[in-house]
From Swiss-Prot:
GO biological process: mRNA processing; regulation of gene expression; rRNA processing; tRNA processing
Species: Campylobacter jejuni subsp. doylei (strain ATCC BAA-1458 / RM4099 / 269.97)
Gene, per the UniProt record: rnc
Lineage per the UniProt record: Bacteria, Pseudomonadati, Campylobacterota, Epsilonproteobacteria, Campylobacterales
Domain RNase III: 4-127
Protein name: Ribonuclease 3
Catalytic activity, reaction form: Endonucleolytic cleavage to 5'-phosphomonoester
Length: 225
């Protein structure tokens, strides 16, 4: 049995039903008939509402579109995996030996899902307000400065607006290569403009690499802004 008391201390919440916490920590590779997918589904809905309400009250002058972008920047696999790592959540997840040997304890998707499942479990046992309090504490601890300008890093859209407006061209993103093991896959993206390479970036997802390449391109095209 894993020392889940340490996890409870980090969460600042002690489960009355320990089996519920174990359920939230059980990956489908460990036991297909008893895993955390349903709790993950619930936790995802809870977190979506918690963060949405938080942003609604924090950014009182922002339009719906900006609030949606802010929520998307916080409610995602990367952000949840960061929070999960702050809890050392990988140490507590039950998974098959094969999955563990494949780097399962470091996979952002597994960590993110487990965090959502835990929030779902807290909601089931203690109610929405308890889940909300814990979720916000974890969010603010890992993202102490929730700034709209920092979070909404949609460099691709900004670059496209500039290039279309100034030179009538739309940037193209080409995958140069994908490399590394499955759980640490990296993607190299080349940003092409008018048939010429303008920037190149490497990241853990195509989307992130494209955003990084767009940011580099924006810096190069600073005179167009």
């Amino acid at each position: 049995m894993k020392n889940i008391e340490k996890l409870e201390q980090s969460l600042t919440y002690e489960f009355k039903d320990k089996n519920l916490l174990i359920h939230a920590l059980t990956h489908k590779s460990f036991k297909k008939s008893y895993n955390n997918e349903r709790l993950e589904f619930l936790g995802d809905a809870v977190l979506d509402l918690v963060v949405g309400e938080y942003l609604f009250h924090k950014f009182t002058k922002d339009a719906e579109g900006d609030l949606s972008k802010l929520r998307a920047a916080l409610v995602n696999e990367k952000s949840f995996a960061k929070i999960a790592n702050s809890l050392n959540l990988g140490d507590f997840i039950f998974m098959s030996v094969a999955e563990e040997n494949n780097g399962g304890k470091e996979k952002p998707s597994i960590l993110s899902d487990a965090l959502e499942a835990i929030i779902g479990a807290i909601h089931l046992e203690a109610g929405f307000e308890f889940a909300k309090t814990i979720a916000l504490r974890l969010m603010e601890k890992n993202f102490p400065q929730i700034d709209a300008k920092i979070l909404i890093k949609d460099y691709k859209t900004k670059l496209q607006e500039i290039t279309q407006g100034k030179i009538g061209q739309t940037p193209q993103y080409e995958t140069v290569r994908a490399f590394g093991p499955d759980h640490l896959k990296q993607f190299e993206i080349a940003l092409m403009l008018d048939g010429k390479e303008l920037a190149r970036a490497i990241a853990g997802s195509k989307k992130e690499a494209q955003q990084m390449a767009a940011k580099i391109a924006l810096e190069k095209l600073g005179s167009l802004q």
